[in-house]
Amino acid sequence: MNLNRFKRYPLTFGPSPITPLKRLSEHLGGKVELYAKREDCNSGLAFGGNKTRKLEYLIPEALEQGCDTLVSIGGIQSNQTRQVAAVAAHLGMKCVLVQENWVNYSDAVYDRVGNIEMSRIMGADVRLDAAGFDIGIRPSWEKAMNDVVERGGKPFPIPAGCSEHPYGGLGFVGFAEEVREQEKQLGFKFDYIVVCSVTGSTQAGMVVGFAADGRSKNVIGIDASAKPEKTKAQILRIARHTAELVELGREITEDDVVLDTPFAYPEYGLPNEGTLEAIRLCGSLEGVLTDPVYEGKSMHGMIEMVRRGEFPEGSKVLYAHLGGAPALNAYSFLFRNG
């Protein structure tokens, strides 16, 4: 496998830390050892997160092409757009963000706090759009790029989750290589890796990266899209493409993609009671914050898998914490009593 042939622009501190979730493990019976790899604190750029790791492999292309404006898209409380705004500010580039109405959640301050507030503070041109949720290429995003061109600028397109970019999966191939180095220091290997999936490139990169040592099927994706067929198909497609890019040496098959689907509902961006319990439990036991859109759902999935005995006793499970806590501000009413 050859990741080093791709240019990488450093935006993170270095390897994100792996920390034990001792109190949560004990609370769940102590038969499974839980750890977290903290992508939520991987960078000094506006709280970082998984998209910052991905952007390290996209930004060299933007700079080589002489682009002056990063153009991206997401929901109103998109972590992606906040991280793109931060990177643009860091590089001295302009930033246009399309924020679509992906979540059927009504709150007076939903479009004024959290991620979108930070993007505005960082100088991004934030454009609200009424279109609903979808993980594909969006007309509103294409229009934003055309607007930049018409103004004489040179846009660099960054799709939702970085996922439709040809290099969108590379960052999390690097994640797997990083974990292998950290495992040498820890003195053990993780039996399972749990990760949230929506647009697909995070899990796709992990599938390829861990396929290098035979652990692709040990990457357990927790769907948060509530459109699992689309998400799984996109993970598989991106993983196959990424495997070719890094010269994995074998084909990625449908069996390599494991996606657990019950935890995404009632729909994208809306938490259920299990999501909220997981957020409170992880917060109160570990001081680790997760959000109602993504990490609260993947944390819920991991907790339920432990409770149901789906991990063999003695398993060491690595939770990939992808970030997202800034969105908690937009859901403050749900936590008004804690």
Curated annotation (Swiss-Prot):
Protein keywords: Hydrolase, Pyridoxal phosphate
Catalytic residues, chain numbering: 78 (nucleophile)
GO molecular function ontology, one term from the record: D-cysteine desulfhydrase activity
Reactions this protein catalyses: 1-aminocyclopropane-1-carboxylate + H2O = 2-oxobutanoate + NH4(+)
EC number(s) on file: 3.5.99.7
Pfam families: PALP (PF00291)
InterPro entries, per database record: ACCD_DCysDesulf, ACP_carboxylate_deaminase, ACP_carboxylate_deaminase_bac, TrpB-like_PALP, TrpB-like_PALP_sf
Disulfide bonds: none
Annotated positions of the N6-(pyridoxal phosphate)lysine modification: 51
Family, as annotated: Belongs to the ACC deaminase/D-cysteine desulfhydrase family.
Subunit comment: Homotrimer.
Protein name in UniProt: 1-aminocyclopropane-1-carboxylate deaminase
Organism: Pseudomonas fluorescens
Gene transcribed to yield this protein: acdS
